[in-house]
């Protein structure tokens, strides 16, 4: 369920201060944050955030298409290694036990 329009988008106060400071100085410095829950505002377009995914910081360059989404959407927390394959088929096709 989307957030009420009357409330406005949520963004952590400390992150908003960093965004405003970066805009005032036109600095291209990466803004490090743990705040995955903060909404991306139009003021943050063109900035790069280092969003924590639980293990490391993932660099996220903000574009216009990202406005309205949360920072955490662009820093995946889980790594998908793929489903296990059929081990019998691998051996029969030409593994060490084949021909």
Curated annotation (Swiss-Prot):
Q: Which GO terms describe its biological process?
A: ribosomal small subunit assembly; translation
From the Swiss-Prot or TrEMBL record, what is one GO molecular function term?
Answer: structural constituent of ribosome
Record's keyword terms, sorted? Ribonucleoprotein, Ribosomal protein, RNA-binding, rRNA-binding
Mind telling me which GO cellular component terms the entry cites?
A: cytoplasm; small ribosomal subunit
Which Pfam families does its entry note? Answer: Ribosomal_S19 (PF00203)
What InterPro entries would the database entry show?
Answer: Ribosomal_uS19 (IPR002222), Ribosomal_uS19_bac-type (IPR005732), Ribosomal_uS19_CS (IPR020934), Ribosomal_uS19_SF (IPR023575)
This molecule's function is given as: Protein S19 forms a complex with S13 that binds strongly to the 16S ribosomal RNA.
Per the similarity annotation, which family is this?
Answer: Belongs to the universal ribosomal protein uS19 family.
Protein's recorded name:
Small ribosomal subunit protein uS19
The organism of origin for this protein: Sorangium cellulosum (strain So ce56)
